[in-house]
Design a protein with these regions (language model features):
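Membrane/wall-proximal cationic-aromatic binding patches
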Residues: 1-70, 180-186, 270-272, 290-294, ...
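Short, amphipathic alpha-helical "lid/cap" segments that border enzyme active or binding sites
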Residues: 86, 90, 212, 216, ...
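Conserved beta-strand elements of the Class I
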Residues: 38-42, 77, 105
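Serine-dependent acyl-ester chemistry module
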Residues: 110-276, 281, 289-294, 331-341
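A conserved hydrophobic secondary-structure block that centers on an alpha-helix together
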Residues: 70-91, 95-98
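Histidine-centered active-site loop/cap adjacent to the catalytic His
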Residues: 303-341
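Proline-aspartate-enriched helix->loop->beta-strand connector
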Residues: 97, 101-106
Length: 341
């Protein structure tokens, strides 16, 4: 995976020692165990960690649920990388994911920044040299996005990354008690500014149309790659907190000195789902269930932009239900095919 830069291997990232490839997932073999089910997850920081202790992450919960349902070994290999967009996720899938011969690929698309983190097609000559470097160079983009993120951290001890190398890779060495749901990641003002910037995707006049053209090509290529290898693909659409938390949305709109009439909060999902229907790509839109449950409880970590424990649990349960009720055939198996280990 030398062509796909990832965080440093063996780094202690929030209590989990990244594996020998720099991924927040257990060590794995290229060849899967006989009769086991292997799922690859692709995405950004939501997929990588969501800034939560490892046991609370939706991929871990989903793996346990599928094992219990199928009564069979299920291996979810998490290829999520923080601070990247769809093009880099595509590269990760092609270089590492395809050689692992998965039974299913789950691609997590976060509407909050996956539209704006994509390189526009044919626009290289229209931007400055420094901007062009940022769009072409992963390391530069990682530094840029990382700076934006960590420059807003409220306290020196708030979920920092320990870069001391560990002797055991791909294992969880932390404690669930390391996570404090009441401890904000960003200062309130900085968090509102982050969420205010994201409002551009909810209006036709400010939507990143050039990036959307590029994303469509990326998704079609991913679909075609999976079809070529006969591997089912499911795209999970992750909502932004502005779409789920009505109180936050009111603050953000006020910060922008706008009104709710200036925005269409379901617009990104409408574009995506229409596209997926047209190009026959299986998808799961999490916005309806998150919007419904978001009225009852908080689903995002306080002033953080990522899901909290309840949000990850809801995502895992929703994906699990989708696979069981409607798309069990994605695995090319049936539950009756596996009646014990």
């Amino acid at each position: 995976m030398k062509n796909v830069p990832v965080p440093l291997k063996h780094t202690n990232w929030g209590g989990f020692t990244l594996n020998s490839k720099g991924l927040r997932t257990p060590e794995y073999q290229v060849n899967k165990s006989p009769n086991s089910i292997r799922i690859i997850t692709i995405g950004d920081s939501f997929t990588f960690s969501s800034n939560l202790p490892y046991p609370y992450h939706f991929t871990v919960i989903l793996e346990d649920k599928l094992e219990s349902w199928l009564r069979n070994d299920v291996e979810i290999i998490n290829l999520g990388i923080p601070s990247v967009g769809p093009q880099y996720e595509q590269k990760m899938l092609e270089i590492e994911g395809m050689r692992l011969n998965p039974d299913l690929v789950i691609w997590a698309f976060f509407v909050g920044n996956d539209f704006t983190d994509e390189t526009p097609l044919g626009k290289e000559k229209e931007i400055s040299i420094s901007q062009n470097i940022l769009t072409k160079c992963y390391f530069c983009r990682l530094i840029r996005n990382g700076y934006i993120l960590y420059s807003y951290i409220r306290t020196p001890g708030a979920r920092k990354i320990n870069k001391t190398r560990e002797s055991t890779s791909g294992t969880y060495i932390g404690s669930p008690n390391d996570y404090d749901p009441n401890k904000p990641t960003f200062e309130k003002g900085k968090f509102i500014k982050i969420q205010s910037v994201r409002m551009s995707i909810y209006a036709k006049e400010t939507f990143p149309w050039d990036q959307w053209k590029s994303i469509q090509q990326t998704l079609i290529e991913v679909r075609d790659t999976c079809r070529y290898y006969k591997i089912p693909l499911l795209v999970v659409i992750i909502p932004d907190e502005n779409q789920v938390n009505s109180n936050l949305l009111e603050e953000v709109v006020k910060e922008l000195r706008k009104t709710m009439d200036d925005f269409q909060m379901g617009y990104p999902q409408k574009l995506l789902t229409d596209f997926f229907e047209r190009y026959e790509i299986d998808y799961l839109d999490l916005l309806p269930v998150f919007k419904k449950m978001g009225d009852e409880k908080s689903l995002y970590t306080l002033q953080d932009t990522h899901w909290n424990i309840d949000g990850n649990l809801l995502a895992a349960e929703t994906i699990f239900k989708y696979l069981v009720d409607r798309k069990a055939s994605l695995f090319n198996i049936t539950k009756s095919s596996y009646n014990g280990r």
